[in-house]
């Protein structure tokens, strides 16, 4: 249970039971019955107790006063402690956060269910009650915001005077490719062959570059949020580690770029894994997506094929499901695709894997590190093939389509390279490109200042690539990207 779930009690209590998993009703009934039994037991034991609940013996006025004060303190002090703890446990550096850590709390913000199972439902619940979102600027006011809005309205008019199209005249597909990156860029690592030759060629002929990731080995949803909202994680306080879990559930409305395409039917999400991860199922509804296709539903993704011994749905299958959605309608859409094929761990999943990795330092790779890297390389090469085939199919369509493709972070398998702090930047750079099909009229476009970027800038870059007009907000992102290429 999340704090945001309590909104159902006042807004949608009638449908609350429909959100519970199968069998949950019996679990609740058993818990209520057990609680009632405990209460009855305590009442019975109280009657057997000669003191009748008194902490100190004695029936005089002073003893009664001492008992009353003791009872009051036993109620107030724990209540005060719990209140103060709940208000501060989500803030980095607070006494409550330190206390929780000492007591063994290990936040698992990627999955609220796992977090509750690992740390306890109450701990998982309280950490999301009062997260510190961001520091309020000293000069923040209505007047200041009006000035900012006017400044970027003017900037948007200047940009739009030189552009002729609209983003919503095309279908735009965001592809977050799980852990996709170039192993040949990892310091101290030598690979026997290129795992991404086709994507490398695609990058040479369209807008492309390197993306600075805020994560290494994880943090997918944060990069996803940045791409959809245009907001960087750098905007938030360090206490806010997962917007999907700590911020979005409590927001009445969350502005996301897919909403430019109007009605919810024009926004589709696809992710071949569990819909509960990062609370995506509920968050995507709030973002304005009509469907979010996953393995667990309620909208079930159509293609679920896996490759050899891999436990994850292949990118080829995910692209097939995406193509089906694109072909379903003549209308233009926004599609958010989050792949799973290259998710960790990596244990000799693929047959006929001829990829090899060795160390260029005086320390050879450990067996488990080498196995993971070589398995990952094969997976990346399969992504390379599937992505090229996907774009080829989009090129056959008669309607304009633009694809924003990016790897969210490097896989957390380079233990040798990550041991050296000097390799930090290299281990946080992935590949991205913005590509348009023939029907778009912007195929082959290459915009300036594309060598380095971050997901929050992709929408502004896509607009420039598509020669599309911008809103004041996109004008702001365009101007910021021209001054600061990458913000993690």
Give residue ranges: language-model regions:
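Solvent-exposed soluble domains appended to multi-pass membrane proteins
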Residues: 157-163, 177, 182-488
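Short, hydrophobic/glycine-enriched beta-strand segments
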Residues: 170-177
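N-terminal secretory/membrane-targeting segments
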Residues: 1-169, 190-210, 247-251, 255, ...
């Amino acid at each position: 249970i999340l704090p945001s779930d309590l909104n159902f009690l006042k807004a949608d209590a009638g449908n609350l039971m429909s959100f519970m998993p199968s069998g949950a009703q019996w679990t609740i009934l058993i818990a209520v019955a057990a609680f009632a039994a405990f209460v009855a037991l305590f009442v019975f034991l109280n009657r057997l107790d000669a003191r009748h609940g008194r902490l100190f013996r004695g029936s005089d006025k002073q003893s009664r006063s001492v008992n009353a004060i003791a009872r009051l303190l036993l109620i107030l002090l724990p209540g005060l402690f719990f209140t103060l703890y709940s208000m501060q446990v989500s803030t980095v550096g607070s006494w409550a956060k330190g206390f929780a850590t000492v007591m063994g709390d290990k936040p698992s913000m990627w999955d609220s269910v796992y977090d509750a199972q690992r740390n306890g439902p109450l701990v998982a619940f309280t950490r999301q009650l009062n997260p510190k979102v961001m520091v309020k600027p000293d000069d923040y006011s209505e007047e200041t915001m009006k000035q900012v809005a006017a400044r970027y309205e003017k900037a948007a008019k200047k940009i739009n005077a030189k552009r002729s199209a609209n983003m919503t005249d095309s279908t735009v597909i965001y592809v977050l490719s799980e852990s996709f990156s170039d192993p040949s860029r990892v310091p101290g690592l030598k690979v026997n062959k290129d795992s991404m030759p086709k994507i490398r060629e695609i990058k040479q002929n369209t807008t492309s570059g390197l993306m600075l990731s805020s994560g290494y080995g994880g943090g997918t949803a944060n990069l996803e949020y940045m791409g959809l909202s245009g907001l960087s994680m750098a905007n938030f306080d360090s206490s806010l580690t997962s917007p999907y879990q700590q911020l979005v559930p409590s927001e009445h409305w969350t502005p996301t770029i897919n909403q430019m395409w109007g009605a919810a039917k024009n926004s589709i999400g696809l992710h071949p894994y569990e819909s509960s991860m990062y609370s995506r199922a509920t968050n995507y509804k709030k973002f304005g997506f009509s469907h979010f296709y996953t393995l667990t539903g309620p909208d079930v993704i159509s293609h679920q094929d896996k490759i050899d011994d891999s436990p994850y749905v292949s990118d080829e299958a995910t692209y097939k499901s995406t193509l089906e959605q694109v072909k379903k309608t003549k209308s233009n859409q926004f599609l958010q695709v989050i792949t799973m094929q290259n998710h960790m761990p990596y244990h000799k999943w693929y047959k006929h894997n001829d990829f090899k990795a060795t160390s260029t330092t005086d320390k050879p790779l450990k067996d488990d590190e080498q196995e993971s890297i070589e398995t990952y390389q094969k997976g990346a090469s399969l992504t390379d093939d599937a992505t090229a085939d996907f774009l080829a199919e989009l090129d056959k369509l008669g309607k304009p389509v633009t694809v924003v493709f990016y790897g969210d972070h490097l896989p957390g398998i380079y233990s040798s390279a990550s041991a050296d702090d000097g390799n930090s930047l290299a281990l946080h750079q992935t590949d991205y490109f913005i590509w348009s099909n023939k029907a778009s009229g912007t195929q082959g476009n290459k915009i300036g200042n594309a060598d380095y970027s971050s997901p929050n800038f992709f929408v502004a870059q896509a607009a420039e690539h598509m020669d599309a007009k911008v809103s004041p907000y996109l004008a702001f992102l365009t101007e910021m990207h021209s001054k600061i290429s990458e913000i993690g």
